[in-house]
Curated annotation (Swiss-Prot):
Membrane topology, record value: Single-pass membrane protein
InterPro entries to which the protein is assigned, alphabetical: PSII_PsbY
Function: Loosely associated component of the core of photosystem II (PSII), it is not always seen in crystals. PSII is a light-driven water plastoquinone oxidoreductase, using light energy to abstract electrons from H(2)O, generating a proton gradient subsequently used for ATP formation.
NCBIfam families: PRK13240.1 (NF009711)
Name recorded for this polypeptide: Photosystem II reaction center protein Y
UniProt record similarity statement: Belongs to the PsbY family.
Family annotation (Pfam families): PsbY (PF06298)
Organism for this UniProt entry: Prochlorococcus marinus (strain MIT 9313)
Assembly description: PSII is composed of 1 copy each of membrane proteins PsbA, PsbB, PsbC, PsbD, PsbE, PsbF, PsbH, PsbI, PsbJ, PsbK, PsbL, PsbM, PsbT, PsbX, PsbY, Psb30/Ycf12, peripheral proteins PsbO, CyanoQ (PsbQ), PsbU, PsbV and a large number of cofactors. It forms dimeric complexes.
Key word Thylakoid present: yes
Record's keyword terms, sorted: Membrane, Photosynthesis, Photosystem II, Thylakoid, Transmembrane, Transmembrane helix
Localization per record: Cellular thylakoid membrane
GO CC terms, sorted: photosystem II; plasma membrane-derived thylakoid membrane
């Protein structure tokens, strides 16, 4: 019963973590590209 409650929370937390990390990596990548061009 507890698992059924925790599973969606775990999935949401993992998904949010991946999204935040992906956004940070994209920003870093864009920064590196602009630095290389400059």
């Amino acid at each position: 019963m507890i698992l059924i409650v925790l599973l969606p929370i775990l999935l949401a937390a993992t998904w949010a973590f991946i999204n935040i990390r992906g956004a940070a990596l994209k920003q870093q990548g864009l920064g590196l590209v602009s630095k290389n061009k400059g």
